[in-house]
Curated annotation (Swiss-Prot):
Name of the protein this chain belongs to: DNA-binding protein MJ0691
Keywords attached to this entry: DNA-binding
One cellular component (GO) term of this entry: cytosol
Gene Ontology molecular-function annotations: DNA binding
Length: 109
């Protein structure tokens, strides 16, 4: 193997990795766009605004709520479109289920 052949193989490997990475990014973008489209159908504009405000404060919680909303809608267990009031009630139920109990203990010496 000469130096040129090694360089060519290395270049091909890098190009292949780059192409795979671009495909993954495109797939993620496509999935995100589909999720947004579903949420647009599921939620009223006011409820979507509320979800976006939640995303700013707690991104992980917003992601979990989105997944649950989509699953419930696909199972037919949500009124479509979901009003802001119904969305608030759903958020309260989800929050109550996922809320961690925080206990503070003070040890005095």
């Amino acid at each position: 193997m000469d130096v040129e052949e090694i360089k060519r193989k290395k270049l091909l490997e890098l190009q292949k990795k780059l192409a795979e990475q671009q495909q993954q990014e495109e797939a993620l973008l496509e999935a995100e766009m589909q999720k947004r489209a579903l949420l647009r159908k599921i939620l009223t504009p006011e409820a979507r605004e509320r979800l976006e405000r939640i995303r700013l404060a707690r991104p992980e919680f917003a992601e979990a709520v989105e997944v649950q909303l989509i699953q419930l809608a696909q199972l037919g267990r949500l009124p479509i479109p979901l009003s802001d009031e119904d969305f608030k009630a759903l958020l309260e139920r989800i929050s109550a289920l996922t809320k961690r109990k925080r206990e503070i203990k003070i040890v005095r010496k």
